[in-house]
Design a protein with these regions (language model features):
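Surface-exposed amphipathic alpha-helical tracts and adjacent flexible/coil segments at the periphery
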Residues: 1-177
Length: 177
């Protein structure tokens, strides 16, 4: 049996091919390639402690590239990388990352490039390699890049503590922890 495994990209709140949320929320069927990603929107939920808005249905992106050799040893025939609704630069970075792993090299640089191309803040290994607490990404939606440092305040002045050397064209985003 030829087995395919999804190794990189966005996870769907529903089982892929079984999503009806987009259809019910606006008549755009995810099963027909027209998903409007209602799972990526902020929702309000109310509990005993009070209510709050969050991206409660937003799953983290999957990344199991470093386990690709284990999957191949288990008989996986094909490794799938998400490309639908992604920029070509993201797909290219994901392919470079996986290729480097299969070549047996250190893929830290490629993973860093991938995170800078598109990253919701954390990756999950899903459930295939044990329960992953990073399965949901309820606090941040959209691309935030790669963490490169910490902003510090000393005597009323702001400093960035980082080993990252910025290059022309780099952008930075400051997030609260």
């Amino acid at each position: 049996i030829e087995t395919e495994v999804f190794v990189q990209g966005a996870l769907c709140t529903c089982f892929s091919g079984q999503c009806y949320l987009s259809s019910f929320a606006g008549g755009n069927s995810g099963n027909r390639g027209r998903c409007k990603q209602p799972c990526r929107k902020k929702y309000f939920y109310d509990d005993a402690a009070g209510g709050e808005f969050s991206y409660a249905l937003s799953l983290s992106d999957l990344s199991v590239g470093e386990r690709a050799k284990d999957l191949a040893a288990a008989g996986v025939y094909s490794f799938k990388i998400e490309g639908r609704m992604r920029r070509p630069e993201y797909v290219a970075a994901a392919v470079r990352y996986c290729r480097k792993i299969f070549a047996g090299g250190n893929a830290e640089r490629e993973l860093s490039d991938l995170k800078r191309t598109y990253n919701r803040g954390n990756y999950t290994k899903g459930l295939a390699f044990g329960q992953d607490k990073r399965l949901l990404s309820p606090l941040v939606q959209g691309h935030i890049g790669e963490k490169v440092g910490v902003l510090k305040v000393v005597n009323g002045k702001y400093y960035v503590e980082s080993a990252f050397r910025p290059a022309k064209g780099d952008g930075f985003k400051i997030l609260r922890q």
